[in-house]
């Protein structure tokens, strides 16, 4: 396996009474959004390092300052930390692990009121697969590459190479 896109996610109920958030919101969110992608990384990264090539993209979230979604947000923040830490172990090699933030898109998870179509996020979401700058542990936000082709997004993300 050369490329892994950890894109599965679980968003728990929106809790207006967030001081009464049940523990299960956290445990379920962490199982799916943090622990599962970490285990997938732990499974595939050693083989990628052994071969000298690989790309892992972990899908994160830009949701911040919303205690109503604390379980979800905390689980994604933990995934960010794991990704950054794992990235430090392969920095400068042709094995790269990064985060991708698709933004708020009209999907089953994002709902019908989201401002962005899934198609508009594609260049920013898959960008990390095509980068070749040997930098790991960064967040690639789809909104930063909106309206670009994939080729334009790669050039914008690595201007010193072009």
Enumerate the language-model features and the residues they cover.
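Active-site loop of short-chain dehydrogenase/reductase
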Residues: 1, 48-60, 92-95
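Active-site helix of classical SDR
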Residues: 41, 75-78
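Short, flexible catalytic-loop segment of classical short-chain dehydrogenase/reductase
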Residues: 65, 102-111
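C-terminal helical subdomain
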Residues: 99-100, 111-162
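Active-site-adjacent segment of SDR/Rossmann-fold oxidoreductases
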Residues: 66, 85-95
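A short, exposed helix-loop element centered on a Lys and neighboring polar residues
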Residues: 41-42, 84
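Conserved NAD(P)H cofactor-binding loop of Rossmann-fold oxidoreductase domains
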Residues: 7-14
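Catalytic Tyr-X3-Lys loop
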Residues: 2, 10, 19-38, 53, ...
């Amino acid at each position: 396996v050369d490329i892994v896109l950890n894109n599965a996610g679980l968003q728990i109920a929106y809790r207006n009474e967030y001081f009464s958030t049940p523990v299960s919101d956290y445990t379920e969110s962490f199982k799916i959004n943090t622990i599962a992608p970490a285990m997938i990384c732990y499974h595939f990264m050693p083989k990628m390092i052994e071969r000298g090539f690989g790309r892992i993209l972990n899908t994160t979230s830009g949701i911040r300052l919303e205690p109503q979604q604390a379980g979800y947000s905390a689980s994604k923040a933990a995934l960010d930390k794991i990704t950054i830490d794992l990235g430090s172990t392969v920095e400068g090699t042709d094995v790269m692990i990064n985060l991708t933030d698709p933004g708020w898109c009209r999907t089953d998870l994002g709902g019908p009121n989201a401002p962005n179509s899934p198609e508009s996020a594609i260049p920013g979401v898959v960008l990390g697969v095509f980068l070749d700058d040997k930098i790991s542990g960064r967040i690639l936000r789809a909104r930063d590459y909106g309206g670009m082709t994939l080729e334009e997004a790669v050039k914008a993300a690595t201007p010193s190479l072009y």
